[in-house]
Amino acid sequence: MQDTGSVVPLHWFGFGYAALVASGGIIGYVKAGSVPSLAAGLLFGSLAGLGAYQLSQDPRNVWVFLATSGTLAGIMGMRFYHSGKFMPAGLIAGASLLMVAKVGVSMFNRPH
């Protein structure tokens, strides 16, 4: 794997983000009995984990991770906008937006 110049490789942030998303779905199920929250959390957490794994193998392979975090940023951003509640929509929207920004910056900073 080539050095990208960052202190922590991008995929480690991706694995943490995937764990956050999946655990959010599990917590939503445990606290409120929400099966859709569990299903969405596990689906998007798994996709984010797959994207992070792909990043660990090839730092240029960002598309699954970018699509997953971008989709979650949009969905949870709209939920946060309409509800005004930081938990869980605002937290996931913010984390997703940060991941989109981090991937975007890494795409523009890498050698072509």
Swiss-Prot record:
UniProt entry tagged with the keyword Metal-binding: no
Classification via InterPro entries: TMEM14, TMEM14_sf
Example GO biological process: erythrocyte differentiation
Membrane topology summary: Multi-pass membrane protein
Recorded GO CC terms: mitochondrial inner membrane; mitochondrial membrane; mitochondrion
Keywords (A to Z) from UniProt: Heme biosynthesis, Membrane, Mitochondrion, Transmembrane, Transmembrane helix
Name of this chain's protein: Transmembrane protein 14C
Native organism: Homo sapiens
Gene: TMEM14C
